[in-house]
Amino acid sequence: MTHNLPVTAYALLGLLTFGDELTGYELKQRADVTLRFYWVSPAMSQIYSELARLAGLGLVATVDDGGGTARYRITDEGRETVRTWMSETPAGFPVLKHPVALRLLMGHLTDPATTRAMLEEYVGDLAAARRDLAGVRESLRGRDAPGEAFHHPSLVADWGLSYFDSETRIARRTMRRMAEAASDGSDESSGSDGSGAGSGTEGDAPRP
């Protein structure tokens, strides 16, 4: 059976597939150390509204822990629903919404020092995010071998660490190019067509 669910609902179902029963708060905690790095970590209110929807559809079941707190587990139908969604719908191409790149595009409208400060701040933010994700990755050690419960989450964490490293390299390379342009008197902040993109090279592509 197929259900017309938002992607967030499928994401929450997926977080319940690791063999444990979670409260809404615990599900929020799990989302904060997983989904926030590559999707969106939903607010508590959204989590509870989605859990109510999923329970009404029979995709999750509630279990009273004896203390009056509801815990949630995925049902067989819920697990099959996630499998169907993954096998019968395309993942789609990710839409990149990059505020730093957007502002860099318009760098010719401000002074180079402002743009450089923005890039330096971004490098600092990347370092902080990488530290957070590295902690998550480390917590998966010992349970991340092929066939173990957290093998695929560890692959996602490694992907995220590589992404942060790549973004850091790109930002630092951009700052170097701006410094070189300033030293030779050229204007690297805008491309020859006025788009602000500059001329890319094969080496500018992010590496996995």
Q: How should these model regions be labeled?
A:
Residues 7-8, 99, 152:
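Alpha-helix N-cap/N′ positions at the starts of helices
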Residues 84-135:
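Amphipathic alpha-helical dimerization/coiled-coil segments
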Residues 146, 183-205:
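Intrinsically disordered, low-complexity terminal tails and inter-domain linkers enriched
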